[in-house]
């Protein structure tokens, strides 16, 4: 069994999708050790509890520095013998302490066809751009914002009659297929 930890900051729909793939056996030989979140009121906590997944709530403001915050996370991850970190809507840049401890073992999913539309509101950026396609990207995490090596992408059309909400649903559907597929290929 490969032990993974999933990091999320918000609703946790990608987190729950991965957990459901593990529970159903579609993601074999993977154990989700815990959800790590940086917001005490994040909805992902409710999703984790529903699936009996332990939750670590660590808000960076509780620590003297980003280094202290990340060193605390590394100690928790090491206690659980975590081998891979899966970012699923975790809205913080990963710093040098976490990167050094899990080099080449941190994945992220981003709702655009990187390198386009890095950062926040990527779907909104694509929607307002005039582009006719967008999509989702899974990539390795490095010290930049959505700059790590791209592993795989999936795309969808942006139709003239799509609302932003419809486009968000299209991209979310891609993510729900893409992330478990990449995890199955990479996390071993």
UniProtKB/Swiss-Prot annotation:
GO terms for biological process: 'de novo' IMP biosynthetic process. One of its GO terms (cellular component) is cytosol. The active site is at 110 (proton donor). Keywords: Purine biosynthesis, Transferase. GO terms for molecular function: phosphoribosylglycinamide formyltransferase activity. (6R)-10-formyltetrahydrofolate binds at residues 66, 91-94, 108. Its EC number is 2.1.2.2. Pfam families: Formyl_trans_N. N(1)-(5-phospho-beta-D-ribosyl)glycinamide binds at residues 12-14. Pathway: Purine metabolism; IMP biosynthesis via de novo pathway; N(2)-formyl-N(1)-(5-phospho-D-ribosyl)glycinamide from N(1)-(5-phospho-D-ribosyl)glycinamide (10-formyl THF route): step 1/1. It catalyses: N(1)-(5-phospho-beta-D-ribosyl)glycinamide + (6R)-10-formyltetrahydrofolate = N(2)-formyl-N(1)-(5-phospho-beta-D-ribosyl)glycinamide + (6S)-5,6,7,8-tetrahydrofolate + H(+). The record marks 146 as: Raises pKa of active site His. It comes from the Bacteria. PANTHER family: PHOSPHORIBOSYLGLYCINAMIDE FORMYLTRANSFERASE. Belongs to the GART family. Catalyzes the transfer of a formyl group from 10-formyltetrahydrofolate to 5-phospho-ribosyl-glycinamide (GAR), producing 5-phospho-ribosyl-N-formylglycinamide (FGAR) and tetrahydrofolate. This is Phosphoribosylglycinamide formyltransferase. It comes from Staphylococcus aureus (strain MSSA476). The lineage of its organism: Bacteria, Bacillati, Bacillota, Bacilli, Bacillales. The gene is purN.
């Amino acid at each position: 069994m490969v032990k993974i930890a999933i990091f999320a900051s918000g609703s946790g729909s990608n987190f729950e999708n991965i957990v459901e793939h593990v529970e159903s056996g579609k993601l074999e030989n993977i154990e989700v050790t815990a959800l790590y979140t940086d917001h005490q009121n994040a909805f992902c906590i409710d999703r984790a509890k529903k699936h009996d997944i332990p939750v670590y709530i660590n808000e960076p403001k509780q620590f003297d520095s980003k280094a202290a915050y990340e060193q605390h996370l590394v100690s928790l991850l090491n206690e659980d013998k975590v081998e891979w970190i899966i970012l699923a809507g975790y809205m913080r840049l990963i710093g040098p302490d976490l990167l050094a401890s899990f080099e080449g073992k941190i994945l992220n999913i981003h709702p655009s066809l990187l390198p386009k539309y890095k950062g926040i509101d990527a779907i909104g950026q694509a929607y307002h751009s005039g582009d006719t396609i967008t999509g989702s990207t899974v990539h390795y995490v490095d010290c930049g914002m959505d700059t790590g090596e791209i592993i795989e992408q999936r795309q969808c059309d942006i139709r003239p009659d799509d609302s932003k909400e419809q486009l968000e649903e299209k991209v979310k559907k891609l993510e729900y297929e893409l992330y478990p597929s990449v995890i199955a290929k990479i996390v071993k």
